[in-house]
A protein has these predicted regions:
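N-terminal accessory segment detector
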Residues: 1-110, 114, 133-293, 297, ...
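Extended, Lys/Arg-enriched charged tracts that mediate electrostatic binding to polyanionic substrates
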Residues: 110-128, 313
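Short secondary-structure junctions
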Residues: 126-131, 275-281, 316-323
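C-terminal structured interaction module
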Residues: 296, 300-347
């Protein structure tokens, strides 16, 4: 089963910068399905109004752009349509999204209800060459029923996603790649990573989501941790990064991942497993202090720095059994992170 999965994902590549590249050249991250559910539940709860539709449209627009610009999914006028449709359906399983059944207008074993609905809308429109209004009903955990109503208006292809200001934009000319470090076990609906069902998500889906919620009001009275200090970003971006960091930290805290750290190499091994090997970027440890007052200085180069930041903070706190103070400076090269014990003020 593992050999079959390795073949299925043989064209997915890992770079020395802690990113994963899918066959089309797009960057993706490897997410546990339950992890994503936990993250999304936390992240959405911060907002004053529901943002579920924002995630659907982020997934739909991103997949629409992918299908519309990758020549492998170009639908011929006469012969060869079936081959393209099979390739489209195979993409679902390869990415771990579930089984798309457009003829039956349903999704089997969806990775996530909102993501699945968004991806399905893009595939249905691409396959039929028309625009549709979509409604969906989750019959149970295994099936989503889709209802499509044709729209007459012409809408241009969704544009390429724009990276947020806090994501490093400098291109590295010398990229070396290797095969995926993770062992993935294939299933009929996707794959498992260890004991957990997992999926690949394009990072551009997150970029589209970020811009759709940037500046939206949070819940009244919501306050972020006083122990996270961020510099180098404007107010709206800082608030969004705080929300991303807090939600990814809570996502990690819900896991049972064990962290034991005595040396810098111990810490770097955990970073490789939880950050770099899953596409969240590269972390360079610049200073590591063990003992009774542990601290660490790092530089983070990540396509999703807000999520990676929360993971690093919660991992460090679990490793040392105590909360920490986090100081983060965003610049044009990376995010500089300093984690150290909280100062206790005695009155």
């Amino acid at each position: 089963m593992i050999d079959e999965a390795s073949s299925r994902h043989s064209e997915f590549l890992q770079t020395q910068f802690g990113t994963i590249i899918e066959p089309s050249g797009a960057k993706v991250i490897l997410f546990g399905v339950n992890e994503f559910n936990e993250w999304w539940s936390c992240f959405e709860s911060y907002y004053e109004a529901p943002i579920g539709r924002k995630l659907i449209y982020a997934a739909s627009d991103d997949e629409e752009h992918h299908l519309g610009t990758d020549t492998g999914y170009e639908i011929p006028k006469w012969f060869g349509k079936k081959t393209v449709f099979q390739r489209m359906n195979a993409r679902w399983i390869t990415m771990g999204w579930g089984v798309n059944a457009p003829l039956d207008a349903r999704i089997q074993s969806p990775c996530h209800d909102l993501l699945g609905a968004g991806f399905a809308l893009a595939h249905y429109e691409h396959q039929n060459g028309k625009r549709y209004q979509m409604e969906w009903r989750q019959l149970n955990s295994e099936f989503i029923k889709l209802d499509f109503t044709e729209k007459l208006d012409e809408i241009p292809l969704a544009p390429k996603a724009v990276m947020p200001a806090w994501v490093l934009k400098r291109e590295h000319p010398d990229v070396t790649t290797t095969n995926l470090e993770q062992e993935l076990e294939l299933r009929s609906f996707g794959f498992f990573m260890g004991r957990e069902r997992a999926m690949f998500l394009p990072i551009s889906v997150f970029y589209r989501l970020y811009y759709s919620v940037l500046g939206r009001p949070f819940q009244a009275g919501l306050k972020w941790s006083n122990n996270l200090h961020i510099e180098g970003l404007d107010h709206s971006s800082t608030s969004l990064v705080e929300a991303l960091s807090e939600s990814s930290a809570l996502m990690f805290k819900s896991s049972d991942y064990t962290i034991f750290v005595q040396t810098q190499s111990d810490w770097e091994a955990h970073i490789k497993t939880r950050i770099s090997a899953r596409g969240f970027g590269a972390v360079i440890v610049e200073e590591f202090v063990a003992g009774s007052s542990p601290s660490v200085r790092m530089s983070l180069n990540s396509p999703l720095p807000g999520l990676a930041l929360g993971l690093l903070i919660s991992m460090w706190e679990r490793a040392h059994g105590a909360p920490c103070t986090s100081e983060v400076i965003f610049n044009t090269e990376s995010a500089l992170i300093y984690l150290h014990p909280r100062k206790v003020e005695y009155i």
